[in-house]
Regions:
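Membrane-lumen/periplasm interface segments of multi-pass, membrane-embedded glycan/lipid transferases
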Residues: 296, 301-371, 418-422, 426, ...
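Hydrophobic, aromatic-rich transmembrane alpha-helices
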Residues: 158, 344-407, 444-447
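Interfacial juxtamembrane loops and adjacent helix segments
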Residues: 95-142, 308-345
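Short acidic/glycine- and proline-prone juxtamembrane loop motifs at membrane-interface regions
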Residues: 187-201, 240
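Membrane-interface transmembrane helices that cradle and orient dolichyl/undecaprenyl
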Residues: 167, 172, 208-223, 234, ...
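Start-transfer (signal-anchor) and selected internal transmembrane alpha helices
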Residues: 1-74, 167, 248, 252-260, ...
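Transmembrane-helix signature of polytopic, membrane-embedded enzymes
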Residues: 157, 162-187, 203, 217-226
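Signature aromatic-anchored transmembrane alpha helix within multi-pass, membrane-resident enzymes
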Residues: 40, 55, 250, 285, ...
């Protein structure tokens, strides 16, 4: 085409456009404007992308930090044994089970902590008092190779949601700042690094809030359905917690419907608000139905929650409240006192930087009010347009309303009082108020942004932009140590307290390090009664009683023998010497292989060391049917030890090499019918009446086809000033050391 031809065609096209109908011109103009809008959107997305990448990196870093704390600070879990409940339930879900069925094993020996016992058709089954939602989340970590991975994922997801909420309530920079402020909260770090339902429930609540805001801004029913699903699952996870968090959003929804109806009636605008509200409500209601259906399956009554089946008086409301052996009259006055204490505790010791962080959050609230100063007043309602989307001021107001909803709502629940009483809140923070960290993080970030921007604006008004930036940077550097000091002050205490208990737990579980089991049975102590994994929640049988190891609580001789017979596994006894103080102080633990000796009789030899300054010795053989008392002849004594040779037969037990002095019956102490216990008690008395006692307890079965079965070695304990040695009495001396001269050696054989 020649230059002349091109010029001619261009002129012809221009003439046609001039003569074209206005509609065509308008269409072209509209198309060009759309292209321009799309181009601006692409440019804006390009600008936003770096902040979104930073937000993703921060969220992943938070998840990594929580994962590290889980494996470093809580390798044996915390001293709150509820973790074992959730992990038991998670293991059950991985095996497709809602119930534990002990079969022929006495259920009292293998009942996990906080499990409800139910008997259906003559079969005993047990289920957790907790919802299966959090255990299902934790099971994801196990599927990925490590239970703790789930904790990191939950923390990362929560941090990402807080970024979105901060961005919606203020801007993306506030959203970015909210993530490290959230991660700087001791309550967030410690609770997120443990296997409780609080962090997963908050993750679901934050997902609900973020989806709700998106639905309200875009009118998208899909986002509404996502919000409803999230809050419905949160209700299934922790019903009361979900309701308290959702109340401000429910209020916003009702206000939006009311304003839209009053303003335009059955208009497209009202129908849009109603449609997204129903999109939220219907999935939420559906999961309420799922919750009730789960109740019906496990408790037999859709309105009886497993929580209430375990402890009917352990719930919300005033009046008599009770769980296990603790009962209290929970009154409004007590609730007010507890709430006052927990508010102070929460805002001074468990948020990022303590009082400084609380002050920054207060500044953030003032910043939100300052931003709305021109839009508040009588005309605010008139400007409130639900059909136009949810403004940043509305998001900030709803987030702020979460604070009174949580604190006032939890005042109606006595659990906070119980947590303060038993010391768990001192170690792990006010975990019932975990949701309150979300608005605190967002408003804390807003406070930081407001102060920095205000300082920058002030500096730019009195000096050059470059000098203002330098001065602002210097100010941030100078203030950093103050912030770090405030953060260290709130983190140091609870972290050190939990680290101390982890050190004690490490000593407790030392016998299990680098040890694997195959078809084993391990008897565990019972300092808190017949509960498995309480307090030793690190030792769990898994999702059933057919795995590599079954843990059973040590009990009566009859029950222990029944457990041995029902399991037919290689048996061990895990025990300890010392006073169990909730892992505040360490104990000396021991894991011993058990043998079942069976024959016409069992002949045992026990050699004990003579404590320093001992002046006399007495020996007793005891059974439930009586006792015999013996003196020690010279032949059984050396300068440093006393040797006792004793025999356990099918009908009686006695000391062979000692001199009989008397007792409840005869030299031979009769055995009880069936399973029983034979105790050898050697007591040394010193000057002034001080004493040291050795006590050995042997579980025996005297009905073994005319012979006897004995579980060997016996439980051996040493104590001072009493002959009834418990676990707590086995530390001898002021620092947990035995008195000089104490030692124990034993051996046994079967006589046919």
């Amino acid at each position: 085409m020649s230059r002349r031809q091109f010029t001619s065609r261009l002129r012809s096209l221009v003439r046609r456009l001039r003569l074209a109908p206005r509609s065509v011109v308008a269409a072209v103009r509209d198309r060009l404007e759309r292209v321009a809008v799309a181009a601006r959107a692409v440019v804006a997305a390009g600008r936003d992308r770096p902040e979104r990448v930073v937000a993703a990196v921060l969220a992943l870093a938070v998840g990594g930090l929580v994962y590290y704390l889980a494996i470093d600070l809580f390798p044996y879990h915390s001293v709150n044994d509820d973790e074992g409940v959730y992990l038991y339930q998670a293991a059950m879900l991985l095996e497709g089970k809602l119930f534990l069925r002990p079969g022929d094993i006495p259920w009292e020996a293998v009942r996990p902590w906080f499990f409800v016992v139910d008997e259906v058709g003559g079969e005993v089954r047990m289920y957790s008092k907790y919802s299966p939602v959090a255990p299902a989340v934790f099971a994801i970590g196990r599927l990925l190779g490590d239970w703790n991975i789930a904790l990191g994922l939950v923390a990362a997801a929560t941090a990402g949601g807080v970024y979105l909420l901060g961005s919606a309530a203020f801007d993306r920079r506030v959203g970015l700042l909210a993530v490290p402020i959230l991660a700087g909260s001791p309550l967030f770090l410690l609770t997120s690094a443990t296997f409780f339902s609080y962090a997963p429930a908050t993750m679901l609540n934050v997902a609900f809030a973020a989806a709700y805001v998106r639905a309200a801004r875009t009118g998208s029913r899909r986002w509404g359905a996502a919000a409803g699903t999230a809050v419905g699952v949160a209700f299934f996870c922790r019903p009361y917690t979900a309701v308290l968090f959702a109340l401000p959003f429910i209020g916003h929804t009702l206000a939006s419907l009311d304003v839209a109806w009053r303003r335009s009636g059955w208009s497209p605008g009202f129908r849009g608000v109603l449609g997204r509200s129903l999109a939220i409500a219907l999935p939420g209601a559906a999961f309420v139905g799922v919750t009730l259906a789960y109740n019906a399956v496990v408790t037999g009554d859709p309105f009886l929650f497993p929580y209430a089946a375990f402890a009917p008086n352990d719930g919300i409301g005033f009046g008599t409240r009770e769980i296990l052996n603790y009962e209290r009259e929970y009154t409004p006055a007590l609730a007010a006192d507890v709430t006052e204490r927990i508010v102070e505790y929460f805002f001074t010791e468990w948020v990022a930087a303590g009082l400084l962080g609380t002050a920054l959050a207060a500044v953030g609230v003032l910043a939100a009010l300052w931003r709305e100063r021109g839009r508040s007043g009588p005309g605010a309602i008139a400007r409130f347009d639900p059909a136009a989307g949810m403004g940043s001021g509305e998001v900030a107001a709803v987030l702020f309303a979460v604070l009174p909803s949580v604190f006032l709502g939890e005042a109606y629940f006595w659990g906070t009082h119980n947590g303060l009483r038993n010391g768990l809140i001192d170690l792990l923070g006010p975990f019932y108020h975990f949701d309150a960290l979300v608005p605190v993080a967002v408003f804390g970030a807003a406070g930081v942004a407001f102060l920095v921007r205000g300082a920058g604006s002030l500096l730019r008004s009195v000096t050059t932009r470059r000098r203002a930036r330098i001065a602002l940077l210097v100010g941030l550097v100078v203030s950093a140590p103050v912030v770090a000091s405030a953060e260290a002050a709130v983190v140091e205490g609870p972290f050190a307290a939990n680290e101390r208990r982890t050190d004690s737990l490490e000593a407790t579980y030392e016998p299990f390090e680098d040890r694997s089991f195959d078809d084993a049975l391990v008897f565990t102590p019972d300092p808190y009664g017949d509960w498995q994994a309480h307090p030793f929640q690190y030792l769990r049988s898994g999702g059933g009683y057919d795995g590599d190891v079954v843990y059973a609580t040590d009990g009566s001789p009859e029950r222990d023998l029944a457990v041995l017979a029902a399991t037919n596994r290689t048996a061990y006894r895990f025990t300890y010497r010392g006073d169990w103080t909730g892992a505040y102080f360490p104990v000396n633990s021991e894991l011993r292989r058990l043998r079942v000796l069976e024959g016409e009789s069992v002949r045992a030899t026990t050699t004990v060391g003579v404590p320093a300054a001992a002046s006399s010795t007495s020996v007793r053989v005891e059974t439930p049917e009586g006792y015999a008392r013996y003196s020690v002849p010279d032949a059984a004594r050396t300068n440093d030890t006393v040797r006792v040779e004793w025999t356990i037969g099918p009908d009686a037990a006695r000391a062979e090499n000692l001199v009989y002095e008397g007792g409840s019956r005869f030299r031979d102490v009769p055995l009880a019918d069936g399973g029983a216990e034979v105790d050898l008690v050697v007591t040394f008395v010193g000057v002034g009446g001080s004493s040291v006692t050795y006590r050995q307890e042997v579980t025996i079965d005297g009905d073994a086809d005319g012979g006897v079965r004995a579980v060997w070695p016996p439980e051996t304990r040493v104590c001072r000033l009493t002959t009834e040695c418990g676990y707590e009495g086995t530390w001898v001396g002021p620092d947990g050391d035995y008195v000089d001269g104490v030692s124990v050696a034993m051996d046994a054989r079967v006589a046919s």
